[in-house]
Every structure is written in structure tokens, then in C-alpha cells.
Amino acid sequence: MKKYLALALIAPLLISCSTTKKGDTYNEAWVKDTNGFDILMGQFAHNIENIWGFKEVVIAGPKDYVKYTDQYQTRSHINFDDGTITIETIAGTEPAAHLRRAIIKTLLMGDDPSSVDLYSDVDDITISKEPFLYGQVVDNTGQPIRWEGRASNFADYLLKNRLQSRNNGLRIIYSVTINMVPNHLDKRAHKYLGMVRQASRKYGVDESLILAIMQTESSFNPYAVSRSDALGLMQVVQHTAGKDVFRSQGKSGTPSRSFLFDPASNIDTGTAYLAMLNNVYLGGIDNPTSRRYAVITAYNGGAGSVLRVFSNDKIQAANIINTMTPGDVYQTLTTRHPSAESRRYLYKVNTAQKSYRRR
């Protein structure tokens, strides 16, 4: 609610986050909430464009952490896919001071997404004794950064040696870019291995599949958000997959945003949904490999859309799949599924899962 309120407040003062919904149950409340969220995201993007200039809009997404401060004049952007951290400011006075504060805060921030509002300029980032980026970034001496003194020294080094500026026609943008360590993805994945193992045992879902879904959905970014309001490491949507899981567990309502931003809760919910897809929605598929391909695709686009690739009748669809080889099922889903995103998704997750199985 805090994020919705912040967006609603800045729109009139200043005159956007996966697009696919998990599951097939489209209800009026979900559509209303999602449409409203999408409108607010569009307003937010427009506001940023007014302040920063054309083609300078950067907004948080599944694999991008973006936090604005200083009346939206300074921003920190972590690209978890590319492994880069870019701190920028358009502050007209003392830009180096604005950058220095943002560098230190970003390097030392914790891993509690529920405490940070990515859609306001409130400086709500707290310095943590266990920084989220610890081990994923090293300073100019090759050391990981845990304490404020080392972060401050590194910030001074960056401002002296790596400060860049560019004029976009509206503003002068000052920036520094930090490269994360080459194995930053593995470093993040390691943080969640215990939670993944626990969920794997609880629901009977292969660890490698959970990790592959997490990598594909968020690149292990606990702050992950999307324009469809999918949240957290496994990009769970409250009103669809989240609601289905709660109902299966005898709980009413839907998981809260803070619940889904908690890594352990997010992994548990996402894994529970994978188990539902495997055991309930797609349980009629006999071959485990064929069923895995269907489950992966369904996690992105819904079980119904997977079955409809083969037949409009769900039972008949399962029967058709059961006459096919796993290779033919894979080929069909990656070429005939109506969603290009879902076709690519199966390829990405299957490829990632192979890499985790080899470890």
C-alpha cells in the first residue's frame, strides 16, 4: 500500500515492472488492481522522463533494482543480468556529494525489500551489517565491502578515477559505474540455497528447477517487481498463483506484498505453485520429462494455455501429450505456444536447469 500511495502522490506533484500473469484464473479484482498498477507505472515513467529527459527513464524491474532519492535527482541502478551498478545524479549543486551518499548506501544496503519503496524518493535505505552486495562487489584493492569506512574510501576512489558526465540536452548527468564480480549470479544464488532445499523437500520439487526458475524470473534479485505486479525472487502474483497456493493450504485471501518480498516465503510459495502445477493442473501427463516441460511453460503462462496448445479439451490434451515423446512435447511448446514469451521461457529455464544439475 505504501508504494501505491507514493505513486498516487507524486503524479499530480510532478505532472514504468514480467508482463505475464501466472495461472489462468482471471478475476475482476485482479484485473482492476493490475490495470490500476499499470496506469501508475506509466505515470511514474512519465514523471521520470520529465525530470531526467527523453530516453532517460529507468525503473525497477524483475532483474533491475532502481532506487531514486534527492527529489528524484539521484538514482542507483543495479542490473543483475549484466552485473553492473550505475549511480547517477542530475543534481545541479555538489553532484559528487550526492553520488557519494548513494554509492555508500547502495553498497551497504540490506536485503529486506519490504523496507524500501522503489517508487518514491524517500531515502529509506538502511546500512546493514550484512550488506546484500557483500561478496558481489570488491573495491579498488580487491576486497569485499562490509563496513562504512571501506565503502566510503571506495566511493572517494570512484569519484576521483571513474566519474563520468554526459549532456542529454536537458541535463548534465554525472555517473559512476561499478562492475560486479564475474560470479555474482552464483554469489546471490548461494544466499538462498538453504531456503531452496527446504522448499524442495517440503513439496517434492527438484532443487535445480527451483533455482532455474529463480534465475530466469529475477536473476536472484529479492527486490524484483514487474509491471504485472509479480513480486520477489520467483515473481509470484498475489491474486493468482499466490491465491491458489493459499487456498490449497487452507488459508483465505492472498499473500501480502511484504510476505512475498520475504525470500523464504516467496520461495516457499513459488515452489508450492510448481508442485500444484505438477501434481494437480498437469498431473494427467504421464511422462515426467514431458510434464516438466509443461510445468515450466505453465509457470510463465498458465496451465490452461499449455493444454490448449494440444487441444481445447483438457483431458484430450493430456492424452495427446501422452502419445508424444518428450522431445516432441518440447518442440511443440517452443514453437506453437501462442505466447512468444512462454516459448522463450521454456528454453531459458530448461537450459538453466541443466547447468544446476551439473553442479
Swiss-Prot record:
Belongs to the transglycosylase Slt family. Its main location: membrane. Murein-degrading enzyme. May play a role in recycling of muropeptides during cell elongation and/or cell division. Its EC number is 4.2.2.n1. One of its GO terms (biological process) is cell wall macromolecule catabolic process. The keyword Lipoprotein applies. One of its GO terms (cellular component) is cell outer membrane. The keyword Lipoprotein applies. PANTHER family: MEMBRANE-BOUND LYTIC MUREIN TRANSGLYCOSYLASE C, SOLUBLE LYTIC MUREIN TRANSGLYCOSYLASE-RELATED. It is found in: Cell outer membrane. It comes from the Bacteria. It is a lipid-anchor. Pfam families: Mltc_N, SLT. It catalyses: Exolytic cleavage of the (1->4)-beta-glycosidic linkage between N-acetylmuramic acid (MurNAc) and N-acetylglucosamine (GlcNAc) residues in peptidoglycan, from either the reducing or the non-reducing ends of the peptidoglycan chains, with concomitant formation of a 1,6-anhydrobond in the MurNAc residue. GO terms for molecular function: hydrolase activity, acting on glycosyl bonds; peptidoglycan lytic transglycosylase activity. Keywords: Cell outer membrane, Cell wall biogenesis/degradation, Lipoprotein, Lyase, Membrane, Palmitate, Signal. InterPro entries: Lysozyme-like_dom_sf (IPR023346), Murein_transglycosylaseC (IPR023664), Murein_transglycosylaseC_N (IPR024570), Transglyc_AS (IPR000189), Transglycosylase_SLT_dom_1 (IPR008258). A lipid is attached at residue 17 (S-diacylglycerol cysteine). A lipid is attached at residue 17 (N-palmitoyl cysteine). This is Membrane-bound lytic murein transglycosylase C. Residues 1-16 form the signal peptide.
